[in-house]
């Protein structure tokens, strides 16, 4: 069984506190985009086999797809195993939920293969044990995600909007970025209510004005390349530009495909991983 595993971007990301166990409390607007990996799963007699077209992708428990399969098999006492083939298109360690969406897609395919009676709610319970972005990736679309990622409220779909996405030639550790964030020193928070209202009113310019990611407080100081990319996007006609997740991917939001194509061509001269895509 073959399925697409779609990436996401954050239209906003706010950190509003920290739990005693160290987890950060989040308030973020998440959006699925039409950039995807391909996941194919076949039933085998025993075990979990991962294969991927990128050699640097781990094929053991470090891979969230493996972890998803293992949790599913254990939870439902399934004696069979699975072979998972991954074709990677989503950049790795990029703030685009590449690993999380692969894991979510594995859970959905395994439901189809083994237990079609399982609800999305139940799948999301398993997903939360894998990572904060995985529950959102089960549903996709446009949603407000709160807590540690488990509280998901769908909103009006912000679909068919044009994005140009740049992933610079380095990766960032989500854990390191959050560990370097000083929550008490976040002085400007996203106006998430205004952002949602802008989406509901189809006001693209207002959406662009209200996009904000507080993790940029950490990354923009340390990585000047990210400042340059954001500035370049605005110079090349983007309505707004923001880092997605914990980075380092940065996207520009456009209202015109010709401008987006010119921007893509310009960025492609400087960076290897550049994409034109749309929200879905």
Curated annotation (Swiss-Prot):
Keyword Kinase among record annotations: yes
Active-site positions on this chain: 8, 133
UniProt-listed InterPro entries: GHMP_kinase_C_dom, GHMP_kinase_C_sf, GHMP_kinase_N_dom, IspE, Ribosomal_Su5_D2-typ_SF, Ribsml_uS5_D2-typ_fold_subgr
Taxonomic placement: Bacteria, Bacillati, Bacillota, Clostridia, Eubacteriales
One GO term (biological process): isopentenyl diphosphate biosynthetic process, methylerythritol 4-phosphate pathway
Enzyme class: transferase
Top-level taxon of origin: Bacteria
Recorded family membership: Belongs to the GHMP kinase family. IspE subfamily.
TM annotation in the entry: none
Name listed for the protein in its UniProt record: 4-diphosphocytidyl-2-C-methyl-D-erythritol kinase
List of residues binding ATP: 91-101
Catalytic activity: 4-CDP-2-C-methyl-D-erythritol + ATP = 4-CDP-2-C-methyl-D-erythritol 2-phosphate + ADP + H(+)
Keywords, comma-separated and alphabetical: ATP-binding, Isoprene biosynthesis, Kinase, Nucleotide-binding, Transferase
């Amino acid at each position: 069984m073959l399925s697409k595993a779609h990436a996401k971007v954050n239209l906003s990301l706010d950190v509003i506190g920290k739990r005693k166990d160290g987890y950060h409390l989040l308030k973020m607007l998440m959006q699925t985009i039409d950039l995807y990996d391909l996941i194919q799963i076949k039933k085998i007699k025993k075990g979990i086999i991962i294969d991927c077209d990128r050699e640097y992708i781990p094929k053991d428990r470090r891979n969230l797809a493996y972890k998803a399969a293992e949790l599913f098999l254990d939870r439902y006492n399934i004696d069979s195993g699975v072979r998972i083939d991954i074709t990677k298109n989503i950049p790795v360690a990029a703030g685009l939920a590449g690993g999380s969406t692969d894991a979510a897609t594995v859970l959905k395919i395994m439901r189809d293969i083994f237990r079609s009676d399982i609800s999305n709610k139940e799948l999301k319970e398993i997903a939360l044990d894998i990572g904060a972005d995985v529950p959102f990736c089960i549903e996709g679309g446009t949603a407000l995600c709160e807590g540690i990622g488990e509280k998901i409220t769908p909103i009006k779909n912000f679909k068919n909007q044009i994005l140009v996405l740049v992933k610079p030639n380095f990766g960032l550790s989500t854990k390191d970025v959050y560990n370097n964030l000083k929550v008490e020193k976040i002085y400007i928070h996203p106006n998430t209510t205004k952002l949602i209202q802008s989406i509901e009113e189809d006001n693209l310019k207002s959406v662009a004005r209200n996009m904000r990611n507080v993790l940029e407080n950490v990354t923009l100081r340390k990585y000047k390349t990210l400042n340059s990319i954001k500035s370049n996007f605005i110079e090349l006609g983007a309505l707004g530009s923001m880092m997605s997740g914990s980075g380092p991917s940065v996207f520009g939001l456009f209202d015109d495909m010709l401008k987006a194509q010119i921007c893509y061509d310009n960025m492609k001269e400087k960076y290897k991983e550049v994409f034109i895509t749309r929200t879905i």
